[in-house]
């Protein structure tokens, strides 16, 4: 339920903001109660033309990848470290997010609104 409200707040914030701007998002690698490693939140939202700044935080001891291929994002975050990644959301659509090192661990999406 918390994810729903977070996603809704992000959609409302993105869709009601004016022209493209800067979007700052924090994404954390966590382990679910079912012992599944995921990046949260699993859905990210931006507007076409936004400059997106991601702060990737890996709370595990193992390294994990984070890839949004449509925007040339392909990073490895070492265990216990964080990494800042910046890109421009220059096209609208729904784009997959995955861990290119452990694809079974991570599934997500970046939604870029027109």
Residue ranges and their predicted role:
Residues 5-15:
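Bacterial N-terminal signal peptides
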Residues 16-20:
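Sec/Tat signal peptide C-region and signal peptidase I cleavage site
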Residues 23-24, 77-114:
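Extracellular/periplasmic metallocenter environments
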Residues 34-43, 68-70, 80, 84:
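N-terminal post-signal-peptidase region of extra-cytosolic proteins
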Residues 59-81, 109:
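Histidine- and aromatic-enriched segments that form or immediately flank copper-ligand environments
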Residues 21-51:
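N-terminal edge beta-strand
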Residues 56-58, 101:
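Non-cytosolic beta-sheet module surface loops
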């Amino acid at each position: 339920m918390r994810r729903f409200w977070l996603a809704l707040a992000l959609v409302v914030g993105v869709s009601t903001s004016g022209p493209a701007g800067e979007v700052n998002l924090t994404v954390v690698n966590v382990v679910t109660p079912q012992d599944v490693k995921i990046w949260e939140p699993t859905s990210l939202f931006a507007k076409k033309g936004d400059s997106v700044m991601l702060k990737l935080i890996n709370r595990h001891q193992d390294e994990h990848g984070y890839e949004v291929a449509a925007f040339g994002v392909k990073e490895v975050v070492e265990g216990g470290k964080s990494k800042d990644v910046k890109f421009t959301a220059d096209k609208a659509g729904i784009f997959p997010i995955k861990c290119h090192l452990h694809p079974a661990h991570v599934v997500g999406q970046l939604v870029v609104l027109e």
